[in-house]
């Protein structure tokens, strides 16, 4: 347990360091150096890393089952602490929300499914999913949209990253009826949070060796709100002369993503635009079932699918594609500095897709979720072996 305590101490030290928000998601290499290990070798501990698991709604529980089965087969040293929070299954309450928050604050790392938000207004404008992200200050959502070898789509060899500010903007939950039949919805944009997400995007590009950041906005219409966001991006860009900076209006960005997505590298944008672009870009490489995502605060990391879709119509039919969730789980292991297990699982998933014999319906095949899980387990082997 001493080794585990040492790694946790190092992680907390990194979190407490100056400007932690920009580097929390990128700290695994620092931990690796501090623990004096060879690259690709896991921390050998007597216990397991505690991780909060939130299955969510729709096919979320089925996808989490896939994660648990693959982790078990790969002997991953992770212990899941499972909680349930659902507005559609009447499993949501202030008490349950506090239990989830307590677990996530203790463990610092979580893997979650989509918590579906009902459209009906029941007296509370902020959904439990939104409240969870706000309370943990999960300001940066990162979605890596990358083509999977062996799976042909309209655009191949695509590799771009979408970074979304997800604690303000249109998701402020500030709505009211100013007069009968007239609803006002407030969009909140602050200099502090706009600068923070811009710096996160440029730090990410620097760390990952990417050459360009594109700020997506609608400042031609929302001159003050999006104007402030764009101004902050421009100011931060000046601090990174080696990174090319471009700006693009959101509607043009949507068209350009469909026509020529290869022009993009890292895109940074406010909340609502990010939600839309995440899903649009996922469709370029195969859909919601194949794109992983993650969200970061200065202290916490949450791993999830890139396109948050509950896929309710597939519940119980054993047809959901676990690719996105398994790749997200692999990213979580890398965040925990479990490089060996992370690579082993990611390579197994990619091998199954490349071979092409086992594919779920969304990928044009007839295989079940169970078939896919078994095939991934069958392709597990020590990375590099």
UniProtKB/Swiss-Prot annotation:
Example of a GO cellular component annotation carried by this entry: isocitrate dehydrogenase complex (NAD+)
What modulates its activity? Answer: The heterotetramer and the heterodimer composed of IDH3A and IDH3G subunits can be allosterically activated by citrate (CIT) or/and ADP, and the two activators can act independently or synergistically. The heterodimer composed of IDH3A and IDH3B subunits cannot be allosterically regulated and the allosteric regulation of the heterotetramer is through the IDH3G subunit and not the IDH3B subunit.
Q: What subcellular locations does the record give?
A: Mitochondrion
N6-acetyllysine: residues carrying this PTM: 199
* One BP term from GO: tricarboxylic acid cycle
Pfam families, A to Z: Iso_dh
Q: Transit peptide: give start and end.
A: 1-33
Q: Which GO terms describe its molecular function?
A: magnesium ion binding; NAD binding; oxidoreductase activity, acting on the CH-OH group of donors, NAD or NADP as acceptor
So which tissues is this one expressed in?
Isoform A is predominant in heart muscle; also found in brain, kidney and liver. Isoform B is present in kidney and liver.
Q: Which UniProt keywords apply?
A: Acetylation, Mitochondrion, Transit peptide, Tricarboxylic acid cycle
| InterPro entries documented for this protein | IsoCit/isopropylmalate_DH_CS, Isocitrate_DH_NAD, IsoPropMal-DH-like_dom
Q: Which family does it belong to?
A: Belongs to the isocitrate and isopropylmalate dehydrogenases family.
**Quaternary structure, from the entry:** Heterooligomer of subunits alpha (IDH3A), beta (IDH3B), and gamma (IDH3G) in the apparent ratio of 2:1:1. The heterodimer containing one IDH3A and one IDH3B subunit and the heterodimer containing one IDH3A and one IDH3G subunit assemble into a heterotetramer (which contains two subunits of IDH3A, one of IDH3B and one of IDH3G) and further into the heterooctamer.
Report the PANTHER family cross-referenced here. DECARBOXYLATING DEHYDROGENASES-ISOCITRATE, ISOPROPYLMALATE, TARTRATE, ISOCITRATE DEHYDROGENASE [NAD] SUBUNIT BETA, MITOCHONDRIAL
* Function in brief: Plays a structural role to facilitate the assembly and ensure the full activity of the enzyme catalyzing the decarboxylation of isocitrate (ICT) into alpha-ketoglutarate. The heterodimer composed of the alpha (IDH3A) and beta (IDH3B) subunits and the heterodimer composed of the alpha (IDH3A) and gamma (IDH3G) subunits, have considerable basal activity but the full activity of the heterotetramer (containing two subunits of IDH3A, one of IDH3B and one of IDH3G) requires the assembly and cooperative function of both heterodimers.
State what protein this is by name.
Isocitrate dehydrogenase [NAD] subunit beta, mitochondrial
